[in-house]
């Protein structure tokens, strides 16, 4: 009940045009020809390749020419890796310290980390360990305002949300999400979402200390070896935000990779986070709102990609309505 990733192996004799484009990049950066090129298709924002060269492995990401949003995301992700090099957060070592131009856009090159992503293989231990590292990410940097992370001379700066605050940004996206749910065959959940945030949206926190947030912390972006975290990937969507929201969104993301688990994925994630990070008393009232908002946003994204079957639509309708009922249960 989540993205269905596929990986296409590109052999040297069939690489053709792709090799003609990528090999020169590799030769320029590594001063050697690639031994193999493997294209990765996992719903990634960028065109991504795993490169083997002289016994070492690398990851090359490309953004399309003319797509400034994609180039900004590539730049943000690479700069986040640079910022995190000397922290407890395990990120890839950098080959290109800034994104570089090629014939049809921009690229970045980093060393490939060991381990495998969680994907559809999560466990209580993996979930706890991942949550601990999310707490470490939140401890990297604090900011004076919330918004999108940008970099100027390697230093992070913030472009405030266009709506003026995280709360107003959430309320606007909830309106868009409810419309998407309704148009995608999840009408009852879309209508209930709109109603509950019209009534309870003012309770969303507007006063908090913004911290560095991954904003896409899912099993797809966490590497494990023997259930231990050995790498964290893809900071392209990083922003300065409320740690509690990033935590809840991440817990939803891990739950969605095994929604039929007989153990409580979200609670386990929160417990792991608390082993490293702090959650004050406001979490009990904020969590139900953030859970509904971030879950609905993710489901809407899957609908837009036509990724949900009729059964999955019914399943997520039930889960969204149950999550909305939790808001009503905790509301004064």
Task: Describe each region flagged by the PLM.
Residues 245-278, 291-308:
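Active-site activation/catalytic loop segments of kinase-like enzymes and analogous catalytic loops
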Residues 282-290:
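Alpha-helical scaffolds flanking conserved acidic
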Residues 44-52, 60, 197-245:
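Active-site acidic catalytic loop and adjacent metal/ATP-binding pocket
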Residues 7-11, 298-332:
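ATP/Mg2+ or Mg2+-diphosphate-binding catalytic cores
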Residues 15-33, 142-215, 328-331:
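An alpha-helical support segment within catalytic cores of ATP-dependent transferases
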Residues 26-35, 86-90, 277:
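Short secondary-structure junctions
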Residues 109-120, 172-176, 295-311:
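A glycine-centered beta->alpha junction motif in the catalytic cores
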Residues 40-167, 182-190:
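ATP-binding pocket architecture of kinase catalytic cores
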């Amino acid at each position: 009940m989540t993205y269905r990733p596929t990986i296409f192996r590109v052999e040297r004799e069939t690489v053709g045009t792709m090799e003609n484009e990528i090999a020169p990049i590799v030769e320029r950066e590594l001063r050697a020809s690639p031994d193999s090129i493997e294209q990765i298709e996992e719903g990634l924002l960028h065109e991504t390749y795993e490169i083997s060269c002289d016994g070492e492995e690398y990851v090359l990401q490309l953004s399309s020419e003319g797509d400034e949003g994609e180039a900004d995301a590539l730049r943000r992700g690479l700069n986040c890796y640079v910022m995190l090099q000397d922290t407890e957060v395990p990120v890839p070592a950098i080959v290109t310290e800034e994104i570089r131009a090629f014939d049809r856009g921009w690229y970045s090159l980093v060393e490939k980390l060991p381990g495998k992503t969680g994907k559809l293989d999560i466990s209580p231990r993996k979930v706890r360990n991942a949550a601990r590292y999310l707490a470490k990410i939140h401890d990297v940097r604090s900011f004076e305002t919330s918004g999108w992370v940008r970099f100027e001379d390697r230093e992070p700066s913030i472009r405030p949300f266009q709506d003026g605050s995280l709360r107003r940004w959430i309320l606007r996206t909830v309106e868009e999400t409810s419309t998407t749910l309704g148009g995608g065959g999840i009408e009852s959940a879309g209508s209930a979402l709109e109603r509950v945030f019209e009534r309870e949206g003012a309770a969303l926190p507007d006063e908090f200390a913004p911290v560095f947030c991954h904003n896409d912390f899912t099993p797809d972006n966490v590497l494990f070896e023997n259930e231990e975290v050995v790498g964290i990937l893809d900071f392209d969507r990083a922003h300065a935000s409320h740690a509690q929201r990033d935590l809840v969104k991440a817990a939803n993301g891990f739950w969605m990779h095994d929604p039929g688990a007989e153990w409580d994925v979200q609670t386990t994630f929160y417990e792991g986070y608390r082993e490293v990070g702090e959650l004050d008393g406001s979490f009990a009232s904020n969590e139900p709102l953030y859970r509904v908002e971030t879950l609905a946003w993710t489901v809407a994204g899957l609908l837009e990609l036509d990724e949900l079957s009729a059964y999955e639509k019914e399943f997520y309708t039930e889960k969204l309505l149950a999550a909305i009922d939790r808001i009503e249960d905790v509301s004064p």
